[in-house]
């Protein structure tokens, strides 16, 4: 009978994976076991720390529901979400860069006509957003589905409010024949990611703040083009260099320009990458 110890256990576990039928699953699981065991050996993980880690992951799962995804939030603050985006979504020069998806997108956002008020009662300073969707060749992309969502002036997304029965600060539009779209909303503000759960505990334990710089989320889809998931960040925000989820890219920083009537205006164009 084979006995296992700290010197031969990793090899034995990997050997058990030898008959995994899917090659990619085999590759991922083999690497995961190897790195996980190496991590435990490197830090000399104690049994109490192992139990604490199990409890932490359990609590993270218990925090998830149809309105909040604590595991995505955990992935975000560990930089894993952004690393995955950066590795898998390299774009040709000139294309709008992607960034993290975030935990507060929901299906079924209302559809709006150009110029409509997407804020729909959300608290904040009024703002107009003007955009254009093109391909890398500069040609307009007509009929692109442009979905946007954002937090309000208090740093909350609509889904974080108990009992709120209408969508606020989120909506879907379609670009016109010239690729253009515009809508009313509120000025983006910096806000803290939810820190009342396990992710917040981790941030406090490591001396990190929970703040994200002000931004608007966009997801843009069009036939013949790769789906773009990105943000537009507000220039001058003090958290641009310390985003809690590592999502800022210089090319995604935009200008919210104050108008003579006291409202604001953001102009930002999006360039999609064609599918092969």
Curated annotation (Swiss-Prot):
Gene Ontology BP annotations: catabolic process; catechol-containing compound metabolic process
Role noted for this protein: Involved in the degradation of 2,4,6-trichlorophenol (2,4,6-TCP). May catalyze the oxidation of 6-chlorohydroxyquinol (6-CHQ) to 2-chloromaleylacetate (2-CMA).
Superkingdom, natural source: Bacteria
Sites where the protein binds Fe cation: 157, 191, 215, 217
Protein name: 6-chlorohydroxyquinol 1,2-dioxygenase
Record's signal peptide: none
Similarity annotation: Belongs to the intradiol ring-cleavage dioxygenase family.
Keyword Metal-binding in annotation: yes
Enzyme Commission number: 1.13.11.-
Names of the cofactor(s): Fe(3+)
Cofactor note text: Binds 1 Fe(3+) ion per subunit.
Induction conditions: Induced by 2,4,6-TCP and subject to catabolic repression by glutamate.
